[in-house]
A protein has these predicted regions:
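Short, well-structured beta-strand/strand-turn elements
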Residues: 74-81, 340-342
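Short beta-strand to alpha-helix junction loop
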Residues: 55-59
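Acidic, PIN/NYN-like endoribonuclease modules and their adjacent C-terminal/linker elements
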Residues: 26-30
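Short glycine-rich or small-residue beta-strand-to-loop segments that form or flank ligand, phosphate
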Residues: 50-51, 77-80, 315-320
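Conserved PLP-enzyme active-site core in the AAT-like
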Residues: 2-18, 23, 33-39, 43-46, ...
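Conserved C-terminal alpha-helix-loop-beta "cap" of PLP-dependent enzymes
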Residues: 298-417
Length: 418
């Protein structure tokens, strides 16, 4: 439809300054990554696979030093064997807590899948932290920000870990910037030096000029099929932070006493190196796609968060569709414009780990990769679509046009021509 193209051109004109700021951030972060690669002298030998125990695996060890350099931390654990972001978070929580310890969440209830790890509900899965005797307490955000006095009050003598989620998850709240953790970190380090601050950094890497570990967080945790994998890494997760804590977490992954010294990968490490190098650019493309979505749907009268004109803390764009028909049609349009499984037609289904049916569009090269263009949302009011990713801005542009077309064709959205 010509009218949809005109809408996109208008939105792009309104976003010129915001796009320029994204380009500036991409330059800063690309230089940081490039400098880390050059310091480590990366060459073809680092891409070679390893087998067996993986002793002295130069590709693995060098890549972990690069991750530590990029996040400005003492050490990092980056492994293909970590199945997801939730798996990396689970590894961290189990590695740092013992029976009788308490975890305090500083950003409200965590993402649905992490609730199962902690054991927050009545029907907790076997092997949860709750089953192991780890206690959990939740402090809600105050006006979209961390309520530091309330977190301080929640910290008891048995508190071992304070966790914070940078991204919104399936919640209508602002995502947090790296500097938003500074006051919390200062309070913990000054008044409770035995407590560790861990930030779930999923969807936030490379969005800003720095990371939570630059502002006092002890640990950052994330998935390689999200931002830092640059849409090239096929699997994996990372933890970056203090050396002592990284060793404890590594002992949970392999075995105490072995830690980071073992762990082979019988495939090339090249995708992990190349993905990390590409990450600042790929994240920039995803941010531009998110901005375009926000501007387009705001111009149509729908509520979005973050709004189009504000600084961004992660790659997720939330849009209140208000009806299940709009949400489903939007996701179907995104799927139709995907390079993989474009013929599929997403429908709501009972996805493991979620309380409500979820509709999900994910025509990605790497299964479940959120840095590639995808959209999803739970079938519950106000029927919010959560869109993220985009290998290229041009693809995101095409996909949003297809999504609008699908919404109009199904009657979920009134044609702008009418």
């Amino acid at each position: 439809m010509k009218q949809i193209e005109q809408m996109i051109l208008q939105a792009e004109q309104e976003l010129k300054d915001a796009f320029a700021r994204i380009d500036e951030n991409e330059t800063v972060r690309t230089r940081q990554v490039l400098d880390a690669f050059r310091r480590e002298g990366v060459s073809y030998r680092h891409f070679a696979p390893s087998t067996g125990y993986g002793y002295d695996d130069i590709g693995r060890d060098t890549l972990e030093r690069i991750y530590a350099s990029v996040f400005h931390t003492e050490a990092a654990l980056m492994r293909p064997h970590v199945a997801s972001g939730t798996a990396a978070l689970s590894l961290t929580l189990f590695g740092l807590t013992r029976p009788g310890d308490r975890i305090v969440s500083a950003t409200g209830m965590p993402y649905d899948t992490l609730q199962g790890v902690i054991g927050t509900g009545e029907d907790t899965p076997p092997g949860s932290l709750k089953e192991m005797g780890v206690l959990f307490e939740c402090v809600e955000l105050k006006d979209g920000k961390i309520d530091v006095p309330a977190v301080e009050k929640a910290i008891k003598a048995d508190t071992r870990l304070v966790i914070a989620q940078r991204s919104r998850g399936y919640a209508w709240r602002p995502s947090l910037f790296p500097e938003d953790f500074e006051e919390l970190a200062d309070m913990i380090h000054t008044k409770h030096p035995g407590v560790t601050l861990m930030v779930d950094n999923c969807y936030g890497e490379f969005v800003c000029e720095d990371e939570p570990t630059d502002h006092g967080a002890d640990l950052c945790v994330g998935s390689l099929i999200n931002n830092p994998g640059g849409a090239i890494a096929p699997t994996g997760g990372y933890v970056a932070g203090k050396r002592e804590q990284i060793e404890r977490i590594a002992g949970r992954l392999t075995a105490p006493g072995l830690g980071r010294e073992i762990g082979s990968y019988d495939a090339s490490y090249r995708p992990f190196y190349q993905g990390l190098f590409m990450a600042p650019h790929t994240v920039a493309q995803a941010l531009k796609t998110a901005l375009l979505a926000s501007q387009l749907f705001e111009n149509l009268g729908l509520e979005t968060t973050p709004p189009s004109g504000v600084r961004r803390a992660d790659i997720i764009q939330a849009i209140k569709m208000q009806t299940p028909e709009r949400l489903v049609a939007f996701c179907q349009g995104i799927q139709t414009a995907s390079p993989v499984d474009s013929m599929a037609m997403p429908e709501p289904w009972d996805m493991p780990g979620y309380d409500d049916p979820v509709v999900m569009a994910a025509g990605t090269f790497v299964a479940g990769a959120s840095i590639e263009l995808s959209a999803d949302g739970p079938i519950r009011p106000p029927y919010t679509a959560y869109m993220q990713g985009g290998l290229t801005y041009i693809h995101g542009r095409i996909a949003l046009a297809e999504a609008l077309k699908r919404m109009i064709e199904t009657g979920a959205l009134t044609s702008p021509e009418s």
